[in-house]
Amino acid sequence: MKELKPNVVKTYSKSSDLANMFQSGEIEAAVVADFAVDIIQGAAENVTYVVPESGTYANYNTVNIPKKAQNKETAFKFVNARISEESQKAKAISLNEGPTNQQVTLSEKEAKNKTYGAIAERAKTVDFNFINSQLADWIDQWNRTMNQ
């Protein structure tokens, strides 16, 4: 991190901050999840989203049913509606979310800037058990290195 620090202009907490930094010319490159690309390109249309050949990391939205849910049948209907082909396609188009339902087919234009197709096939998953076990140390190291 010490070697990277001189090249880090600042960090951001929401994609609109990043969009503003691109728009103002404050930055020229950033690490960003695909769902934020449309927001950034809305502010700075010359920005290009690139996924390295080595792949990207899949970032999942989840829908969960609590173990003690009182109306599990309705909850399962909600989950099924949420992952339906129709719902997933609509969210892919309107929210720039890569579909999890493999029955969803997107045109080349609709698939642009999404973890979909060949990009999704080479996406890696995050080991949250490992991350959570290291997180406190990483945050401490980040704060000592980057925030000094």
Where are the regions a protein language model picked out?
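Solvent-exposed loop/turn segments at secondary-structure junctions
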Residues: 35-38, 54-57, 70
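Periplasmic-binding protein-like
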Residues: 1-4, 44-67
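Extracytoplasmic/periplasmic, Sec-exported soluble proteins
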Residues: 10-14, 57, 66-71, 130, ...
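Sec/Tat-exported extracytoplasmic proteins
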Residues: 4-8, 12, 26, 41, ...
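Extracytoplasmic/secreted proteins, especially bacterial periplasmic and envelope-associated proteins
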Residues: 3, 13, 17, 21, ...
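Ligand-binding pocket segment of bilobal, Venus flytrap-like solute-binding proteins
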Residues: 1-48
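Extracellular/periplasmic bilobal clamshell ligand-binding domains
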Residues: 108-148
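Mature extracytoplasmic/periplasmic domains
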Residues: 57, 66-123
